[in-house]
Amino acid sequence: MSKITFKITLTSDPKLPFKVLRVPENTPFTAVLKFAAEEFKVPPATSAIITDDGIGINPSQTAGDIFLKHGSDLRLIPRDRVGLRWTR
């Protein structure tokens, strides 16, 4: 089984830290997203992965599919209060 390498950059930090993750190509991308978020100490439930061009990635694919469609350089965006609705 071949492995895929992703470079995931944390966009919320001005220093733009990154992690290099190497995973089997059939790994569910939701697991990659969760692991990357935990490595950066941000909540995985409210985080998203985008491409360098700003295109959102649907995580319900395999790591191999993401790599073929979007390449290896990705960005992690921790989102705060996603879907929160203020009512008074």
From Swiss-Prot:
**SUPFAM superfamilies given for it?**
Ubiquitin-like
Q: Which Pfam family is an annotated match for this chain, by its short name? A: Ufm1
UniProt keywords (A-Z) are:
Isopeptide bond, Ubl conjugation pathway
- Indicate the cross-link positions, Glycyl lysine isopeptide (Gly-Lys) (interchain with K-? in acceptor proteins): G83
Q: Name one GO cellular component term.
A: nucleus
Highest taxon of the lineage: Eukaryota
Extract the InterPro entries matched here. Ubiquitin-like_domsf (IPR029071), UFM1 (IPR005375)
Which Gene Ontology BP annotations are present?
A: protein K69-linked ufmylation
* Cystine pairs: none
**Residue ranges of the propeptide:** 84-88
Family, per entry? Belongs to the UFM1 family.
Q: Briefly, what is this protein's role?
A: Ubiquitin-like modifier protein which binds to a number of as yet unidentified target proteins.
Instruction: State the protein's name.
Output: Ubiquitin-fold modifier 1
